[in-house]
Amino acid sequence: MTDKIAVILSGCGVYDGSEVHEASAACTAISRAGKKIAFYAPDKDQFHMVNHVTSEDDTDSKRNVLVESARIARGTVLPLKDFNIEDVDAVIIPGGFGAAKNLCSFATSSEPQVDEDVARILR
């Protein structure tokens, strides 16, 4: 047992990343249980961005999932490609539409695929 829980983030924001309240609630529960948190996210461009004030697509911006995830983590977020299951006791993936856009292609494809690093971790 490592006393560490991995939280895999998919950016920051309910429409194009991790849902902030769900991620925060998970982190609070982990902390209250006396466990450490290790944040991970894919180091890649977000599939698409949303202006969270207007709920409209933001076609002018380009954002990185790892960088945006640091907004929630308020610190270190490790690249998902470096994840090792031996380093943690459990994995949590908070909701938000980013999970369906940045961790897989379920939101965008008629033949959806899971991100290869996510698939490796969940096997």
Show which residues each predicted segment covers.
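Extended, subdomain-level signal for the structured scaffold at the beginning of enzyme domains
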Residues: 1-123
